[in-house]
Amino acid sequence: GFGSFLGKALKAALKIGANALGGAPQQ
């Protein structure tokens, strides 16, 4: 369903965002 798609998109966005940060130190 649409909710499942949103969930997958959100997880993908978070994963891409984390990779974009390049492992910046989390404070």
From Swiss-Prot:
The keyword Plastid does not apply. GO terms for biological process: defense response. One of its GO terms (cellular component) is extracellular region. It comes from the Eukaryota. Keywords: Amphibian defense peptide, Antimicrobial, Secreted. Its main location: secreted. The keyword Transmembrane helix does not apply. It is found in: Secreted. Expressed by the skin glands. Signal peptide: none annotated. Belongs to the gastrin/cholecystokinin family. Antimicrobial peptide. This is Caerulein precursor fragment R5.
